[in-house]
């Protein structure tokens, strides 16, 4: 580890520095996807994020050069570590030091597993994880749509599409998301407080969260967001799910198409999403809708001995 470097707990005065590191490690630079300090503050202020206890920064000469944030998912006994190190400070052992902090935090939380997501092309990060006892367990595709023709949703009789309503639909969305993703790898059930905070983030709009209903009963949903600059806008399909009782009716395609229509109507230049590479039905649906695979990330895990009592 570099002489003079310290790894310490995050402080709220670190928001701008952490934002700069986040943008650097994700190659966001001056793109429309870059976080600003206000959005990072919103993100870190969400319920259960707790950055003062579960975020650590690496600092040298009063400069924050890296960070790690540990997300604690108590319902499924999991923690997720995310973060990284500024480009000029890599290959100096700082990333390994931050990873060790994440491992220690996960152990103190008594979780069963710690997960870390890295680029499939991040050979250095993969080597560090493997030497620290992590094993690759899952791949995710990042996909992009650049089409001009928007697919149109086709609904069975009696079904309709409506937008989310702030102050009314938080519990509905929470319940639908939890039941739709209950059996999916890595999904931790959400609380109403968590969903209420997320729908109010700057890059979300109520109109961009869509429900398909069956005579008023929520059957499927699509949750979109938009990152925009003065010159470019990218739309994201962040979550999409169908209630188990309504699967096999074509609602998955219909709700994704509805989300795509909404995003294109807002003037986005492209639409992006990610999907579990082993989720064949979802992956094939996106391919049929015109999405192309543009990147892949890998999930690594470190398991901990099961604790009794």
Each model region followed by its residue ranges:
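Conserved donor-binding loop and adjoining core beta-sheet/short helix segment
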Residues: 12-15, 23-109, 118-119, 219-233
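Conserved acetyl-CoA-binding loop-helix of GNAT-fold acetyltransferases
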Residues: 91-104, 239-242, 248-265, 284-288
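Phosphate-binding active sites in nucleotide-utilizing proteins
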Residues: 182-224
